[in-house]
Swiss-Prot record:
It is an enzyme of class 2 (transferase). Its cofactor is Mg(2+). It holds the Pfam family Tam41_Mmp37. Its EC number is 2.7.7.41. This is Phosphatidate cytidylyltransferase, mitochondrial. One of its GO terms (biological process) is cardiolipin biosynthetic process. GO terms for cellular component: mitochondrial inner membrane; mitochondrion. It comes from the Eukaryota. It is a peripheral membrane protein. It catalyses: a 1,2-diacyl-sn-glycero-3-phosphate + CTP + H(+) = a CDP-1,2-diacyl-sn-glycerol + diphosphate. Keywords: Lipid biosynthesis, Lipid metabolism, Magnesium, Membrane, Mitochondrion, Mitochondrion inner membrane, Nucleotidyltransferase, Phospholipid biosynthesis, Phospholipid metabolism, Transferase.
């Protein structure tokens, strides 16, 4: 499955991508410099840092080549060599290694490297919801291999986002409410939303990008047996019966199911997952339990990945990057009506 992507500026993005070793299974750009957000002008978009994620089959080989071609992108960790860099990438945080504040084509970029296997694992099971969460929202796909497992996982991740959102929404809701819920999944529990991010970030992402969200989710909603989708009215109705919610809970990614069982199961009872989810399906607070489960995943990965980012970026870049984030948060605060 190829996610929808904007077609303009193809040459610009190609020039940036060509600066790197080309062994990508997936390369995409995301964020406020790629998709306009409410309250940001074209001028702000051009000034914003461009964010990329590169999935690669062999991180050691990729970092080896990138250290030859782009050694200055790395912090002091470059002196450890590609094997140690790859170990830091895979063993800590969310399995992503970021280089930030990199000059390219008269812009500043940040790029994260993740192994294809780790990406597929996150897409299918929501182990960290770090990259999987970014892919719940519209992104610009730059390169995508023919890896069938990856394509299937990308689609599965979108379906999981829809199902999880159904569980947290009322019986009837608007298309915009659904996309707000989906866009907010990967920010739920993220400590950076308390300090360092614009508090209206989720709304800003959705308001100006409804058409991109429709492109991403329309077919899934049309084919989903759990929902009545009325695209002309922009309304949806979902099955909120215990049976319907149980079916949805059983379709959630494995890590989220495990988090839910930890929240609900009493110590020492050791009931199986199916029994616990059946109990949750009958609970009036089912949606709240799902929300807490997602928050626990995101909170853990956001803290550990941010801590790793201090080492991978280096102190000077960390201070500079954090300052830029705080400036964006300040602009968002100033835009709010009194």
């Amino acid at each position: 499955m190829s996610l929808p992507a904007l077609q303009n500026s193809a040459v610009f993005y190609r020039r940036i991508i060509n600066r790197f070793p080309q062994d990508f299974s997936l390369a995409f750009a995301y964020g406020s410099a790629v998709f306009r957000q409410t309250g940001s002008s074209q001028g702000h978009m051009v000034k914003n840092m461009l964010d990329f994620v590169f999935a690669v089959d062999d991180p050691v080989t990729w970092h080896t080549m990138n250290l030859i071609e782009n050694r200055k992108h790395y912090s002091f960790l470059r002196f450890l060599g590609p094997k140690q860099i790859s170990s830091i990438q895979s063993d800590y945080g969310a399995g992503v290694y970021f280089n930030t504040l990199v000059p390219a084509e008269d812009r500043l970029i940040k790029y994260g490297v993740i192994s294809t296997d780790a990406l597929i694992d996150d897409l299918l099971h929501w182990k960290t919801l770090y990259v999987a969460g970014r892919l719940h929202k519209p992104v610009r796909i730059l390169l995508q291999s023919e890896n069938g497992n990856l394509r299937s996982a990308l689609l599965g991740n979108l379906k999981s986002a829809v199902i999880a959102s159904f569980l947290m929404l009322p019986e009837s809701f608007s298309e915009e409410e659904l996309y707000l819920q989906i866009a907010g999944l990967s920010y739920s529990g993220d400590f950076r939303m308390v300090f360092g991010e614009d508090k209206s970030k989720v709304s800003n992402i959705v308001k100006d990008n409804m058409q991109h969200f429709r492109q991403l989710y329309n077919r899934i909603l049309q084919e989903c047996p759990q929902v009545v989708y009325k695209p002309q009215q922009g309304r949806l109705e979902v099955d909120k019966s215990p049976e319907g919610q149980f079916t949805q809970l059983m379709a959630l990614p494995r890590t989220l199911q495990q988090q839910i069982t930890r929240l609900v199961d009493r110590p020492g009872k050791n009931r199986d997952v199916e029994e616990i989810l059946l109990q949750v399906a009958q609970d009036p607070d089912c949606g709240s339990v799902v929300q807490q489960g997602i928050s626990s995943i995101v909170k853990s990965s956001s803290i550990t990945q941010s801590a790793k980012g201090i080492a991978t970026a280096g102190l000077v870049k960390t201070v500079s990057y954090s300052t830029k984030k705080l400036q964006k948060m300040w602009r968002g605060w100033r835009r709010k009506p009194a």
